[in-house]
Regions:
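Extended alpha-helical targeting/anchoring segments
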Residues: 1-505
Length: 505
């Protein structure tokens, strides 16, 4: 096993007190991200897998596995807390002295590492989610609604092992960050890093010992229930339309939460979801007491090399059964005045969000009103970019765009007040973000859509519809049901696979 950097170069940086990474690479043509997760993470909590599928068909270049964090940061009830001994005392969280966003900014700064050019930006950093209700730390909003699920408002982990799959080079790079400690010599730190890498390489080299999850006999169909009846949701839509008619808002996104039993391991749902609903942002995050499985189509905010990007998706049609039908649906979507007006409203909101942190006159709409195709649907998409002003950082950019207008409404703050009034329960994870702050302090995040939260044998899926002046309440109710279907279809697929394993097929 060849390790980079060499021990002497490592020791020099260590002596200067610089954080750095140690890494090794191997050929990956016989390994997949899924098999690697089963080998190296198994059932260990505080691990994750991030993947990507572009256009519903082409795998993205990088897939990322992270595990064994040295720290976990979270926000509970508006207060930040951190566990710096996660590997030895997983329940030992201490409150942070600063307000949550200030504490997070300090953690991002603390976690910066200068990576070599041969490694991608996500080879080290902090990874996780910020739930929708983190916006209460950014805007003045009423107290949240009741929270029957009870997960933290945010969780971010800093893995000591990151496994990077490069689909272009057919290579796996295993990376372990090292941060100098006064009580540990450079030789000892390097030896421990080598041991961590060796353990992962040994696990990857071993045959897959995983047995498919099995399911006890029972129905395979998943029948979800909602926290909102159809009649209640239709009344919510009618109330929102009254606010629109009164001039309070132009649009608001109203959601409901569906749930159904799910007794299989959460990773079984992820494996099914990546097959039935591939998307640009595929993610599996295991936090021990709960797991997150998602296939989001939409960027929230990206900050890369000084450029801030927001890509609003608004306006939807199903994919056609034939190329001609697909093209006809595209033409119909682009000609739909209601869809175009809604998209333009959210494009303007995205431009304003970027403008809050971008240099003067740098905000540009680089593409607008083009169609992006996914496995099941197509959307109208636009792309907004701006150059990050030097007085702001990636966290400022995230706060400027949080939550996305496509899951809240316009004007955003008034729309969120109406969401609090009309929705019955705290949103929690839904409409927040999943992503990472890289070792360079950059950001890649997506909106939490088409996502299941699995806790205590139950999967929760939240979906919403954008309400405008001419919305039909029954149609908006059906849109929520349709958007949630992909996750429950994946659950049925996972159950079918497990049932076949039980029968020995």
């Amino acid at each position: 096993m060849q390790i980079e950097p060499q021990a002497t170069a490592f020791a020099k940086r260590y002596a200067r007190g610089e954080a750095q990474v140690v890494w090794t690479s191997l050929v990956s043509d016989l390994e997949t991200p899924v098999s690697a997760v089963l080998k190296v993470a198994g059932a260990r909590p505080m691990s994750f897998l991030l993947e990507s599928v572009e256009g519903g068909a082409v795998r993205g270049r990088y897939s990322i596995i992270g595990l064994d964090p040295d720290l976990v940061w979270r926000t509970v009830a508006g207060r930040a807390e951190i566990n710096r001994g996660m590997r030895h005392q997983p329940d030992s969280f201490a409150p942070c002295n600063e307000a949550p966003l200030a504490a997070l900014r300090a953690l991002i700064a603390e976690s910066r590492i200068e990576l070599p050019d041969v490694l991608p930006p996500m080879a080290a950093g902090i990874f996780g989610y910020l739930g929708y209700d983190m916006v209460r730390l950014m805007e003045e909003l009423p107290r949240p609604n009741p929270d029957p699920i009870g997960i933290p408002d945010a969780v971010l982990v800093r893995p000591t092992i990151v496994v990077v799959f490069d689909a272009v080079k057919d290579a796996i790079t295993v990376v372990t960050p090292v941060r100098p400690q006064n009580s540990i010599t450079a030789d000892t730190a390097f030896a421990r890093a080598r041991e961590r890498l060796s353990a992962i390489i040994d696990a990857l080299d071993a045959p897959l010992a995983h047995s498919p999850p099995t399911l006890q006999a029972g129905p395979l169909t998943v029948w979800p229930s909602s926290n909102t009846t159809p009649a209640e949701y239709e009344r919510m839509v009618s109330a929102a339309k009254e606010y629109i008619a009164a001039g309070d808002i132009f649009q608001v996104v109203l959601s409901q939460r569906f749930e159904a039993p799910f007794e299989l391991p959460p990773f079984a749902l992820y494996r099914a979801l990546r097959r039935v609903n591939p998307a640009p942002f595929l993610y599996f995050l295991d936090f021990g007491g709960f797991s997150i499985v998602g296939s989001s189509p939409e960027i929230l905010v990206r900050v890369r090399e000084g450029t801030v990007t927001i890509r609003p998706l608004a306006g939807t049609r199903p994919r056609g059964a034939t190329p001609n039908q697909d093209k006809a649906l595209e033409t119909e979507l682009l000609a739909d005045e209601k869809e175009r007006a809604e998209h333009l409203m959210l494009l303007d909101l995205g431009r304003n969000d970027v403008g809050r942190v971008a240099r003067t006159a740098s905000v540009k709409v680089t593409d607008q009103f083009f169609i992006e195709r996914f496995s099941q649907v197509m959307h109208i998409v636009s792309n907004v970019e701006g150059q990050l002003d030097g007085k702001y950082d990636a966290l400022d950019a995230l706060a400027a765009g949080f939550p996305a207008g496509t899951v809240s409404g316009a004007p955003k703050v008034r729309a969120m007040e109406i969401i609090d009034e009309l929705e019955q329960e705290k949103r929690g994870l839904y409409a927040g973000s999943v992503g990472y702050f890289s070792a360079a302090g950059e950001l890649d995040s997506c909106i939490v859509l088409r996502t299941a939260l699995i806790k205590d044998g139950v999967m929760y899926v939240q979906a919403g519809a954008g309400i405008v002046a001419d919305s039909n309440p029954k149609s908006e109710q059906q849109e929520c049901v349709d958007k949630a279907k992909a996750l429950f279809r994946a659950a049925e697929e996972a159950k079918r696979f497990a049932s076949a394993a039980r029968r020995g097929q």
